[in-house]
Amino acid sequence: MTALNPVLFLLCGVSVSLSLKVVSKRGSVDGCTDWSVDYLKYRVLHGEPVRIKCALFYGYIRANYTQAQSIGLSLMWYRSSGLGHGDFEEPISFDGTRMSKEEDAIWFRPAELQDAGLYSCVLRNSTFCMKVSMTLLVADNDTAGCYNSKLRYTEKGELGKSKDISCPDIQDYVQPGEKPQITWYKECNVQQWRSSVLQTADLLAIQDVREDDIGNYTCELLFGGFLVRRTTYLSVTAPLTEEPPRILFPSENKLLAMDVQLGSMLNLTCRAFFGYSGDISPLVYWMKGEKFIEDMDQSRIRESEIKTVREHLGEQEVSITLTIDSLEEVDLGNYSCYAENGNGRRQANVQIGKRVELMYTVELAGGLGAILLLLALLLSVYKCYRIELLLCYRHHFGGEDTDGDNKEYDAYLSYSKVELDQWGQELQEEERFALEILPDVLEKHYGYKLFIPDRDLIPTSTYIEDVSRCVDMSKRLIIVLTPSYVLRRGWSIFELESRLRNSLVSGDIKVILIECADLRGVINYQEVEELKQSIKCLSVVHWNGPQSNKPGSRFWKQLRYTMPYRRPQQTITNHALDTSEPGPFADLQTVSAISMATATSAALAPAHPELRPSLRSSYRSHSLARQKHSHYRSYDYELPFTAGGTLPPQHTYCNLPLTLLNGQRPVNNKTLRQHSLDEHHGNNAMLPLLPRETSISSVIW
């Protein structure tokens, strides 16, 4: 009875163990109970010792190896020829050196790569049989490392809190009652640990975990001439949160309203932040009203998988997208995004409404864009070629200007003539333009009828009245602003007569101002600006030197635009206007700058004997001028000589100084003969002048 007690105890233990591990039990083969593969795996690096214990004595039966032997049970070891359980097994033959059997375990001193596989221990006698298998993994170190990443243990530490890292599975290498001598490494390197990291017999204690503590920690133990290493990977997380997740978009506290066009595709993305809450996965989902999206019948509406946008120390930002392929009326309404963890739930709402449809939006925008582009192009062309376009229109569709049909001339030409002492010199370019080129082109090429005072003025009354009458007979007033004209204040002629001044101010006559040079350096330039301000109907045209003489230049186009329209009577070739070249200006005569002075001198031919030599000399010079410049008309007056030294009252038109027009006489150094002449005729308004007076008189027309 006493001998049966151990057997009964073993059988009772087996029955209890069977009831406890019924889930893991694989079955019975040949009358032997097979517990398949034990969950505990033995992992070792190549060259390290390892001990594999029979798992039957550590959770499957309530007996140890000694008790099993005492009741006649024997323990046998097998190795599977394959990697899978149930493959052909063969008994292990122990050589007693590198591989040996010791009680309920087998030792490898050391383990080699070919030792990896399944090892089965079988406890049996003639009436009882039980079997279980264990797994052995043998691996080499990683390149340049002291561990293999597949054989690592893992631990987690919270930021700012303490963490203990143990040296696992070294019980078989330490004698009972002894403290193991362990050396710790981080990333296979010896460390100078900070003060908050402590080493004990089999622990590495970190008092305050930091982010830079993440890494591989290796403990090394010397056993029987062999090194035993265990490596643990420490990951650091944020402190365990006690807060519910936070929705980033849409806003939790504000309803997001969206107007969407029917038939269009809609994507709504919800983003949420989850603090570290252990190994619990974040939960985010969409609902419409009280319905989950997956419970809705429409296949057009779906939500994506939860995606991790970013993650740091266990804290995650995740997103989930709600997609509606083709929005319909039934899809309009309120949609809610929910995010929850073990600490609570948050939600954000989106209201989807119908957008007012804009028909042909793209076509309309494209059409408007094309129209605006065309308008901008047309405005640019008009701005750059405005004069050319207006002239072209006027040439093809316009009639001749009927404004001022009762006027005989198209324009009155006001200009400045050159002094007599400059007669033998080459005319300046501006004077040549004003006296030669401008009248010739306007009359011969464009067919305009100009009133040129040197040529067309017939004295009928006073000088100012004649000028006023001639200006009234013209549709335009052309003022050629040469430096000489500005210096002499040529516009004073039009300011002296009130009727002329009123015409300029009121706009009864249109004025064309031709600037022939940069006049800013001229002393009277400020008066020129005041003149421009006082004229109501004013057009300013700039002559830029010889380059403006070409018929196709912008100067002539602007001038034609400001002149009354008249169809041209003849054409000219397109080259620079130069009287030295044959062409339309080959017959151009040089304009005499002293024609009226010539007329005055001729009128004084029979004057006082004392004046006769100088007058005769002046007459000869003026005769030469008339021969050279026969283009202009001169006037001869026969004035009888009076013996008493006085001239009879004779109506004579002459060129007077502006000072005389203002009621003053010029003050200069005169001879006694000139003084006597002035005193004798001081009260005569219109007098013939001496040649010297003629040379310094006004030459403004």
Curated annotation (Swiss-Prot):
Belongs to the interleukin-1 receptor family. Residues 20-361 are extracellular. It comes from Danio rerio (Zebrafish). The lineage of its organism: Eukaryota, Metazoa, Chordata, Craniata, Vertebrata. Its EC number is 3.2.2.6. One of its GO terms (biological process) is negative regulation of exocytosis. Keywords: Cell membrane, Cytoplasm, Disulfide bond, Glycoprotein, Hydrolase, Immunoglobulin domain, Membrane, NAD, Receptor, Repeat, Signal, Transmembrane, Transmembrane helix. Residues 1-19 form the signal peptide. This is Interleukin-1 receptor accessory protein-like 1-A.
